[in-house]
C-alpha cells in the first residue's frame, strides 16, 4: 500500500492562505518511494507418474503449495503399484504409456516427475533408457518441459536392525549411482532443468530421531494408529513421513524458503509438530543443492 492522503481527505484552504495570495507557494517536496520487489512464484502443471512411494506426496503437494501462497498449481497423477510404477514398466505397458502420453500431448505440462527405479537402472547403476524415452517424448510435445526424479526410501524397514543398517545402502547408492545418473541426464538435455527429489532421506532422518528417543510424535516405528513413521511392513509413509517428504517435494519443485511455510497448519494426532520439520526439510534440500554445486 502506498503512503499518502486517502481519498476521503478534502483539501481545505485556511483563511491565511486566502489572504496571502501574493506569496508564491513553496515548491513541492520531492518524495522518494521505496517499493520492495516481490518475486511472484508461478504455479506449475506437474505430472507424477509412478508407484506408491511417490503418489502420496504428489497427492498432498497441491495443499502444501496453497499453504505456501502459490496459485495455479495443477497436479496430474498416473499411478501403478510397486515395480509397475517404474519408468521402464510404465513405458513397456502400451495402455499406461498411451494414458501418460495423452496428458503430455496437451503440451502444457511444466514438470514431469518420475520415481526410481527401473529394472535396467538397478542393473546398470548408470543409465535408464526408459527415463530418456519419457524425456524425449515430453520434449517432442513441449520443449519447455522440465523433469524431476524422485529417490524414495528402502522398503521393508523392519527387516533392518537399526537406522545405520537401514541407511547404508541408500546413502551409498545416492552418492555413487543416483547423482552421477542425474548429472548424465543434465548433460544429455542441457535445455531442461532436471532435479533430484531425495524424499527418501526423510525416512532415514525420522528413523534416526525415533531410535534416539527424539521423535515425540511417534511411539511405534510401524503403526497405522497411533501413526508411526511407516504404516505397514512394506514401509508406506505414515503422517509424519508424508508431511516431511511433501515439504521436500515443495522445496525442490518451487525452491521456496522453508522458513516462510506455515508449519503450524500441519497436524499429527490433532496437534502441531514439536519436531522441527522445516529445519529438517531445509537441511535435506541444502545438501542436495551442495551436491549439485560440486557435480553440476
PLM-predicted stretches and their roles:
Residues 50, 54, 58, 93, ...:
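Solvent-exposed, acidic/flexible segments
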Residues 14-45:
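N-terminal low-complexity, Pro/Thr/Ser-rich intrinsically disordered segments
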Residues 220-296:
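Conserved catalytic region of serine esterases and O-acyltransferases that act on ester linkages
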Residues 101-239, 251, 260:
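Alpha-helical cap/lid subdomain in secreted, periplasmic
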Residues 3-4:
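C-terminal motif of bacterial Sec signal peptides marking the signal peptidase cleavage site
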Residues 45-49, 53-137:
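Conserved SGNH/GDSL esterase-like catalytic core that processes O-acyl groups on lipids
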Residues 7:
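Short, conserved catalytic or interaction motifs in soluble domains
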Residues 56, 63-71, 103, 137-141, ...:
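Structured segments of extracytoplasmic/periplasmic soluble domains
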Amino acid at each position: 500500500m502506498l503512503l499518502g492522503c486517502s481519498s476521503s481527505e478534502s483539501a481545505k484552504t485556511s483563511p491565511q492562505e486566502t489572504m496571502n495570495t501574493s506569496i508564491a507557494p513553496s515548491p513541492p517536496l520531492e518524495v522518494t518511494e521505496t517499493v520492495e520487489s516481490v518475486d511472484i512464484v508461478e504455479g506449475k502443471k506437474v505430472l507424477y507418474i509412478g508407484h506408491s512411494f511417490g503418489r502420496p506426496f504428489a497427492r498432498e503437494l497441491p495443499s502444501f503449495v496453497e499453504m505456501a501462497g502459490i496459485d495455479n498449481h495443477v497436479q496430474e497423477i498416473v499411478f501403478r503399484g510397486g515395480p509397475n510404477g517404474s519408468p521402464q514398466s510404465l513405458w513397456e505397458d502400451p495402455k499406461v504409456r498411451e494414458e501418460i502420453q495423452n496428458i503430455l500431448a496437451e503440451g502444457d505440462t511444466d514438470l514431469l516427475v518420475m520415481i526410481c527405479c527401473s529394472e535396467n537402472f538397478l542393473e546398470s547403476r548408470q543409465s535408464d533408457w526408459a527415463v530418456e524415452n519419457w524425456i524425449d517424448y515430453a520434449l517432442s510435445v513441449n520443449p519447455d518441459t522440465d523433469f524431476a526424479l524422485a529417490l524414495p526410501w528402502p522398503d521393508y524397514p523392519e527387516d533392518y536392525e537399526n537406522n545405520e543398517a537401514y541407511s547404508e545402502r541408500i546413502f551409498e547408492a545416492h552418492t555413487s549411482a543416483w547423482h552421477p545418473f542425474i548429472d548424465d541426464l543434465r548433460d544429455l538435455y542441457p535445455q531442461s532443468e532436471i532435479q533430484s527429489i531425495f524424499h527418501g532421506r526423510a525416512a532415514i532422518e525420522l528413523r534416526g530421531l525415533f531410535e534416539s528417543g527424539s521423535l515425540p510424535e511417534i511411539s511405534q516405528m510401524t503403526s497405522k494408529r497411533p501413526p508411526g513413521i511407516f504404516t505397514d511392513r512394506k514401509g508406506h509413509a505414515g503422517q509424519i513421513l508424508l508431511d516431511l517428504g511433501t515439504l521436500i517435494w515443495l522445496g525442490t519443485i518451487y525452491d521456496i524458503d522453508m522458513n516462510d511455510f506455515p508449519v503450524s497448519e500441519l497436524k499429527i494426532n490433532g496437534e502441531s509438530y514439536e519436531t522441527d520439520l522445516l529445519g529438517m526439510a531445509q537441511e535435506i534440500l541444502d545438501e542436495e543443492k551442495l551436491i549439485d554445486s560440486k557435480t553440476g
